């Protein structure tokens, strides 16, 4: 990891975290500046409201919680606060460990997020060795069509451009734990579906425990292995930390966050904050307000994502 500077991590950690999902990143996009949002649907709210709006809808559903200083039972300080111990959060924690960055991973649940036994990476060496190649232009267009043009194409580009490097990084870690990480050469024939022409890119990477994998690691999921990795370096996930709000300075820069814990409110002060909390698919009110098309025609009802990260970052 010598070629990755501390600054490059803090400005682009989501690029590494992106390998954790097949084609997307956990977490929410940062609030955009007025220049970036010129001509878009996001715009400033009426003067004095302190809210960003999407159309006529406040991005923050309700007022920001007001927590008195006297209600804070503990204050922590760190260089990097990672909010959420799911796919993106744990990948970021491992990279921060490698770079020697002081960090806190705050997770509201009692365990790291679940993972599958595969992920997607674009044009990795193993793909070329199998005589295949991902058509990135076609894949980019397929993803945009699949999401009705509403996905963040900047995130897709990060995955298209950088997932191969991240795959090499993840593969080394998994291999050291006794896992065989292999490209599925039977996938990605370039077409699929019934009665339609659907592009299926060769991107699937599987990982399974080798015969020589130590028993204590053989049944662990990727994020559990990542947790063990950071534990061995003296770090741990802070569980039972439910995000209440982000804290900011007078200029509006994020300075950390306040969490609700069983002991009371805890303020984590951080020079840098990385939001890896997931989306809001399990919050019907927010879905109706911000993404009514998805709410009207849901593809899945199994999500457990509620909006603390998106809510707080709005």
Labelled PLM ranges:
Residues 80-104:
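N-terminal Rossmann-like FAD-binding beta1-loop-alpha1 element of flavoenzymes
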Residues 272-314:
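Glycine-rich loop(s) and the adjacent beta-strand/alpha-helix scaffold that form part
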Residues 76-78, 263-272:
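Core beta-strand elements of the Rossmann-like FAD/NAD(P) dinucleotide-binding domain
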Residues 123-159:
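Glycine-rich active-site loop/strand segments that organize a redox cofactor
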């Amino acid at each position: 990891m010598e070629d990755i500077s501390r600054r490059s991590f803090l400005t682009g950690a989501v690029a590494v975290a992106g390998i954790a999902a097949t084609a997307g990143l956990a977490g929410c996009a940062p609030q955009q500046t007025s220049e970036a949002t010129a001509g878009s649907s996001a715009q400033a709210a009426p003067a004095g409201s302190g809210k960003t709006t999407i159309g006529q809808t406040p991005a923050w559903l309700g007022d920001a919680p007001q927590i008195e200083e006297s209600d804070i039972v503990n204050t922590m300080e760190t260089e990097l606060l990672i909010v959420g111990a799911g796919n993106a959060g744990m990948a970021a924690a491992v990279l921060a460990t490698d770079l020697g960055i002081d960090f806190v991973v705050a997770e509201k649940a009692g365990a790291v997020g679940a993972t599958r036994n595969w992920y997607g990476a674009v044009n990795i060496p193993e793909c070329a060795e199998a005589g295949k190649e991902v058509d990135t232009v076609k894949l980019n267009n397929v993803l945009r069509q699949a999401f009705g043009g509403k996905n963040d194409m900047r995130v897709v580009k990060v995955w298209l451009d950088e997932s191969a490097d991240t795959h090499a990084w993840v593969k080394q870690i998994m291999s050291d734990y006794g896992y065989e990480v292999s490209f599925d050469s039977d996938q990605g024939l370039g077409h699929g579906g019934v009665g339609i022409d659907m592009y299926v890119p060769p991107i699937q990477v599987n990982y399974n425990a080798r015969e020589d994998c130590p028993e204590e690691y053989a049944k662990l999921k990727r994020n559990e292995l990542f947790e063990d990795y950071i534990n061995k370096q003296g770090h741990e996930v802070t569980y039972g930390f439910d995000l209440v709000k982000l804290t900011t300075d007078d200029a509006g820069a994020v300075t950390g966050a306040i969490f609700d814990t069983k002991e009371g409110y805890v303020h984590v002060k951080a020079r840098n904050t990385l939001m890896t909390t997931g989306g809001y698919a399990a919050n019907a009110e927010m879905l109706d307000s911000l993404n009514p098309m998805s709410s009207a025609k849901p593809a899945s009802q199994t999500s457990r994502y509620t909006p603390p990260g998106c809510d707080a970052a709005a």
